């Protein structure tokens, strides 16, 4: 697969069911700052690739983590 095919395939692999499973696994808590929907009920949680897709990361449970929107925006692809 070329890089564009890899990126498209991995993005398509991120289903709503997978997103929900990762958030549940992580107890609806940001893996960086520890904020959660229990502390901030309207907190926007996102599922993040630990190793970015752009660097060869895969959309698999062991490469995914729950982050609050603030931490996800501050995280770079490095």
Residue ranges and their predicted role:
Residues 1-34:
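Short, charged surface segments at domain edges that flank catalytic/cofactor-binding sites
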Residues 35-67, 77-78:
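Histidine-centered nuclease catalytic patch
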């Amino acid at each position: 697969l070329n890089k564009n095919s890899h990126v498209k395939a991995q993005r398509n692999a991120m289903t709503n069911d997978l997103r929900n499973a990762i958030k549940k696994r992580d107890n609806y808590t940001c893996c960086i700052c520890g904020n959660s929907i229990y502390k901030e009920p309207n907190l926007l949680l996102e599922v993040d690739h630990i190793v970015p897709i752009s660097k060869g990361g895969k959309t698999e449970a062991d490469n995914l983590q729950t982050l609050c929107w603030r931490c996800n925006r501050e995280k770079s692809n490095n």
